Curated annotation (Swiss-Prot):
Residues 88-108 are annotated as: Disordered. The gene is E. Plays a central role in virus morphogenesis and assembly. Acts as a viroporin and self-assembles in host membranes forming pentameric protein-lipid pores that allow ion transport. Also plays a role in the induction of apoptosis. Keywords: Apoptosis, Host Golgi apparatus, Host membrane, Membrane, Transmembrane, Transmembrane helix. It comes from Avian infectious bronchitis virus (strain Beaudette) (IBV). This is Envelope small membrane protein. GO terms for biological process: disruption of cellular anatomical structure in another organism; viral budding from Golgi membrane. GO terms for cellular component: host cell Golgi membrane; membrane. InterPro entries: E_protein_CoV, IBV_3C.
């Protein structure tokens, strides 16, 4: 209240009231500017998400499904992956066992 009393003594009640009103008006305008900025940022994010992120993800899924995904469903490739995978797990300290499906042999 010391600042208010000093302003009242030096400037009078009219100018002090005017300064207070101008201060509140400045705070109001600052709030409106921030609100407009947040609204613009929200619209920008929504635009990029709608027109870039979602179509990009769907396009990537589509390309994967009809290119690499189709190749991965090849039974010959699956047989190679399954049969050449070590039969004793990931972190086993024993030497890996590999199975040769074409010759029905087990290698270690």
């Amino acid at each position: 209240m010391n600042l208010l009393n000093k302003s009242l003594e030096e400037n009078g009640s009219f100018l002090t009231a005017l300064y207070i009103i101008v201060g509140f008006l400045a705070l109001y305008l600052l709030g409106r500017a921030l609100q407009a900025f947040v609204q613009a940022a929200d619209a920008c994010c929504l635009f990029w998400y709608t027109w870039v992120v979602i179509p990009g993800a769907k396009g990537t899924a589509f390309v994967y499904k009809y290119t690499y995904g189709r190749k991965l469903n090849n039974p010959e490739l699956e047989a190679v992956i399954v049969n050449e995978f070590p039969k004793n797990g990931w972190n086993n300290k024993n030497p890996a066992n590999f199975q040769d499906a074409q010759r029905d042999k087990l290698y270690s």
